[in-house]
Amino acid sequence: MNSSTHRSAPANGARWLTQALEAEGVRTLFGYPGGTIMPFYDALVDSSLKHILVRHEQGAALAANGFARASNQVGVCVATSGPGASNLVTGIADAMLDSVPMVCITGQVATPLLGTDAFQELDVFGLTMPIVKHSWLVRSVDDLPRVVADAFRIAREGRPGPVLIDLPKDVQLADASHLPVHVPSSVEPPPAPAEAAIAEAIAALAAAEKPVVYAGGGIALGDAVQDLRDFVEASAIPTVMTLRGLGALPANHPHSLGMLGMHGTRAANMAVQESDLLLVLGARFDDRATGKLAEFAPFARVVHIDADAYEISKLRSADVAVPGNVGHAIRALRAAFPSPKAHQDAWRKRCAQHRERFAARYDAPGQHIYAPAMLKRLSELAPADAVIACDVGQHQMWVAQHCRFNHPRNHLTSGALGTMGFGLPAAMGAQFACPDRTVVLVSGDGSFMMNVQELATIARCRLPVKIVLLDNSSLGMVRQWQELFFAERYSEIDLSDNPDFVALAKVFGIAATRIDARDDVEGGLAALLAEPGPALLHVAIDARANVWPLVPPNTANSTMLESNPAHARQEIPNAIPA
């Protein structure tokens, strides 16, 4: 909302749109003004909407993305035509691949100019078609009620995702006094699964001797976190989670084996590879989770439950397909399994032994700050309901491995697209969504610089985001792969000319300090979390540190590296000893 002593906005399309957004429950939106979207910004002056002026449109899209992830509400971003719209694209694609509900509004040249290569004209409808659930080029103000209602419904229904409304300037300026008051859209939950499919799933699970629950991001998307916890508590079935499923079970839950896949736990990967049944809940067999798909869970039948029927059998054929409401299906399973099955006791014991035997160790040799230990301590010191956002790179995997999440929405990470620069604007959006909670960003020196301009937004809004910046003066994950798989032929990964991040933060008016020694970690983290406003902790780490364990590309999860392959490779046994 902006204060003004000037005239009220006319009853035009732009004004109608701001009122419709208010009716849909939108309170905060992120954007950057420009020529073709100026009527909308004029209407904002008389609106209750809180507009956050970012410093780059990609920041707007990613902030709306983070807002939606943290709040389970629709994120809204706004940009002008041409470069403004194209700058949104990465954030929109990230939302599409991670199933994040967003409504993206772009200005467009006036309808008589469409197709004339007018100044800042861009076919954003065509440009975004592969990365949205639906898009509209609104050619008449009379279409606005239908378009807005459909946009918010489609963004939220079924498998959530982004939609885009491309709004020509003359449509924004057109008289809208005759349009009806907007009625908020309603969303029907996914249908309940067929009873026959549920019965088949129950029978398969009851017959299994070595079942594993494989939980993905669909648990949170389907509001089924508590349903999953109740089911696992009752059945005591060992459970693994994907990157975006982390937190579906608390990290300290006795039946949680942690994350599976390329950088997952040995216990999780061993359990999956040895299992005779996978109960797949809201997961999609992503390559980072499965490793070499043909050798993934080679002995297991698959029961696949998902709200998105198109995901079932897309990559791994399901023996039992259960499309529909995930929470409904889990509750049915819970009713069928009120207590653990005795014939699965040996399996539970074996998985528990793996969990204990292969628990992460934090006593790494050397003097450098050990990032896994530091992140574990950060997770312990931060409030239990803290939101931890991260960027993409080695630190992203360390966060997934060593931070403890009590709910999937406490963990904001760019899973499918792997967007460097995601973290800072996403944390910003999360802080607006959760003003009374601690929001921490863990970033790396490579990712941080990609959207560093949003420090200005955080400072201006006095958002109390806490930033832990891990600095190894390189593109760490690229360097690690060049070390392991490209014969240590290092190419274009040196960031030793990074700026002074403490001085940089202070220029923006953000409190900042640097630590270099292990003895400084406790005090540095405590001071960071105690800051009342935004703050940055610059952490120097070993430039040669790698993320372990690691499943090499195009290999089975039964093969995990614990160190440079020039030294040794350890393989996971595939069967329980008799």
Label for each model-derived stretch:
Residues 122, 150, 154-207, 560-562:
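Conformationally flexible catalytic loops at phosphate/diphosphate-handling active centers
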Residues 38-111, 113-120, 267-286, 312-323, 327-333, 397-475, ...:
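Thiamine diphosphate
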Residues 106-147, 152, 245-349:
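Glycine-rich, acidic loop regions that bind phosphate or pyrophosphate groups
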Residues 14-17, 22, 32-35, 40-42, ...:
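Active-site diphosphate/adenylate-binding microenvironment
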Residues 14-26, 66-72, 96, 154-159, ...:
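Glycine-rich phosphate/diphosphate-binding loops that line cofactor/substrate pockets in enzymes
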Residues 1-8, 142, 178-180, 208, ...:
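Phosphate/pyrophosphate-binding active-site segments
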Residues 69, 217-303, 405-437, 449-453, ...:
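Glycine-rich, anion-gripping cofactor-binding loops and their flanking helix/strand elements
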